[in-house]
Amino acid sequence: MEIFKTAFLMVALMLVFIAVGGYVGGEQGMMIAFLMAAGMNIFSYFFSDKLVLKRYNAIPVDENNAHGLYEIVSRLTQKANLPMPKIYIIPEEVPNAFATGRNPSHAAVAVTEGLLKILNENEIEGVLAHELSHVRHYDILTGSVAAILAGAIAMVANFAKIGTLAGQNQNSQRNANPVIMLIIAVVMPLAATVIQMAISREREYKADKGAAYLTGHPEWLASALTKLENYSNSYVMQNASEQSAHMFIVNPFGSLTSKLSVLFRTHPSTSDRIAELQRLEQEIKRGM
């Protein structure tokens, strides 16, 4: 069911992009929009992992200098039948983690120093199982495409507004319509953001479920989320960006976004995630 929901949201996002491109430049605008999206998606496919790891100054580690962490990842990948990903530690005291990479064969998982300090081994395993579930279901690629399309829609909408104000658009009479301009300049980018956030939230629930069944202990991840949420409500990660916030296991901006409408959250509420994990715990126990 989650796959169909995500597919529907991705199609909706693409339709918003087509609508904006078509209004701005007609058939030519649609073609340009598709070419832009294709170019950005290709770039993201091959380089987004390197860019995000560099942004957070992630340091590669192996079994020699991070034996415990390496052992946990190795054990989980064997259980999940996944290739061993590259492992990184981020020099950051705020506890958090993310996965990146275009597919399971080119994946990386990164955790902050703060996470390794405040979580016990079981909780760390729960977090890493969550991240490996993202890898297993190609969530990184899905999230990257959604983020790029949403950004492209905002950019094209801004061009439309500038072009109309400057009177340079050949379809100036049509574009001058204030209602249509409001839709292009405000409503369309807003709709794109809402859809992007919905995709992100759906994938978080799916990764939580994957972690629960991979470890067999949903309570490990639930306990980790409780600690991470408590810490993130008091501190914000250095270099945190809105573009990559959806990648982390908890929002790196913490309480700064807690009062926003649910439509604009990159993650489901932690209380909802924990409640679902508790339900899964009972489900797993009944199946034993």
UniProtKB/Swiss-Prot annotation:
Tell me the residue numbers annotated for binding Zn(2+).
130, 134, 204
Q: Which residues cross the membrane?
A: 6-26, 28-48, 140-160, 179-199
Q: How is the cofactor bound?
A: Binds 1 zinc ion per subunit.
Q: What class of enzyme is it?
A: hydrolase
Highest taxon in the source lineage? Bacteria
What biological-process terms (Gene Ontology) are attached?
Answer: proteolysis
Membrane topology per the entry is: Multi-pass membrane protein
Quote the catalytic residue positions.
131
Q: Which EC number(s) are documented for this chain?
A: 3.4.24.-
Cofactor section: Zn(2+)
Which Gene3D superfamilies does this one have? Metalloproteases ('zincins'), catalytic domain
The protein's UniProt keywords, in alphabetical order, are:
Cell inner membrane, Cell membrane, Hydrolase, Membrane, Metal-binding, Metalloprotease, Protease, Transmembrane, Transmembrane helix, Zinc
Any one GO MF term held by the record is: metalloendopeptidase activity
Which cellular component, as a GO term, is one annotated location? plasma membrane
Subcellular localization is given as: Cell inner membrane
Similarity-based family: Belongs to the peptidase M48B family.
What PANTHER family does the record point to? PROTEASE HTPX
Q: What is this protein called?
A: Protease HtpX homolog
